[in-house]
């Protein structure tokens, strides 16, 4: 019987009409492009630590992880940049250690009424003061304003005109909470009331980083394409980079084939970020460099970066992320921002870059931390996030096509004379399918040079295993327009004695 049926048996003799459906030629792959935010939760949250959970709103994030928690703040930044795509949270309990603490000292009392535009972790906290307020009253007003906003990542208490601000969560990450005032300055209508002076000691003393053994284990085989992992200590990064690595047990290994990429952020001066880049070398990880002067915590920068990357790469994994805005993130003031030469150096050092050219920071180059091959020589194979993002799309397309069209097929040599309709393939048939898939990918702007691909594509039966097909798949990934260089060789007038050979 030439036609290969899957359900209707060959010995069926009952009349009359029997039909089975075969979707192998109809379907196309659909991928959710799931994001995962990893962060510390508070004890007041209802979520189970180390267990991933889908989140659909900021209200859910607050309830699950605790208002003012690190992870709740990350969701706030994510939703400000991407409210359309699927996102999960992976809460971890506070590490053993201490919470960061800082102070706001009311040095002199106001002589006129006004509003203090206080900023805590980049969040505006307006505090009204009267002309007759003493330093103690002002300090108490600051505490009341802070305690009234549950979304803030700190608590506050005042003694003798000094407000002590303490992070709600323990860990080294709590050191990144910034306290300032009048961020937008007089041009933005923000200045301290006349006579009032405040002195800040930024939060410090936060210690400890979470352990991720259980959290990573509980992810199981769930596919997550865009992971926001804001912890940049070497132990945390190694744990996640191992999970998403190329090894046999990694998500990019041939056994699991889950793929996925990691996004993070790190604050520091230029030399510190360059030094940090020297310690990392992972194709799957992209760390965004942030200036010291930004009042927004790095864990929210990381969430914003992840959100914009997820939204853009899901639409087109080969398109560059440059100029995508990182909404809700407050950049450092202009005199604290990286120079263009420093940004260029960071890009070469394996640090993703952002720049503020108007009022909102935008992604400049989505570099990964991969800069060297196994011998320690410089290598740009995995320099950009778009490379693995594009390969993810190509390999999933290919896997969907092969597993849908040839799920239970026989394998024969090229030239075998088998009947039409048989569930049988040859190397030439498989090669034709791969070429057809490549043409679709080329039409969709993921690859180029289809003729060269067909020439270099190899599909053959394994000489030692007659049931196995080996494929050398050589895609030419489409590139991005990242540099437009112009030599403006001007004239004051053509045919001025220098260009006499130019025709009129």
Protein language model features and the residues they cover:
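Structured, hydrophobic secondary-structure cores that serve as assembly/anchoring elements
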Residues: 1-88, 323-328, 342-504
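A glycine- and small-residue-enriched flexible loop/hinge signal that marks low-structured segments
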Residues: 36-38, 79-83, 144, 219-416, ...
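Extended, beta-strand-rich, solvent-exposed assembly scaffolds of outer structural proteins
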Residues: 57-65, 108-178, 227
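Disulfide-bonded cysteine-rich modules in secreted/extracellular proteins
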Residues: 97-110
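Surface-exposed ligand/attachment interfaces on beta-rich extracellular proteins
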Residues: 106-108, 131-133, 158, 206-214, ...
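Bacterial flagellar/type III secretion structural subunits and associated motility module proteins
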Residues: 110-112, 116-119, 184-210, 219
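Extended Gly/Ser/Thr-rich low-complexity repeat segments
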Residues: 119, 173-189, 242, 487-490
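Extracytoplasmic/secreted envelope proteins and their assembly/folding machinery
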Residues: 136-143, 212-216, 237, 241, ...
